[in-house]
Amino acid sequence: MIQVTRLNGTVFTLNALYIEKVETFPDTTITLTTGTKYVVLDTAEAVHSRIIEFYQAVQLLSNPHIRGEEHEE
């Protein structure tokens, strides 16, 4: 889960596994795989960082092939 802030200042969490895309229109808009959209105060870069941190925490990026590495060390 990642924490984000709505435009009205309300903080909530999203399951990062359901995030399909993050766009800036200029407000940051997060679209889920369900089609639900959230407009948040957080920058797209901050959301991307939180998504990566979440993936690392659940070891989703622990496979070197998923990370783009060709040879496992």
Give each language-model segment a name.
Residues 1-13, 17-73:
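Eukaryotic intrinsically disordered, low-complexity regulatory linkers and tails enriched in Ser/Thr/Pro
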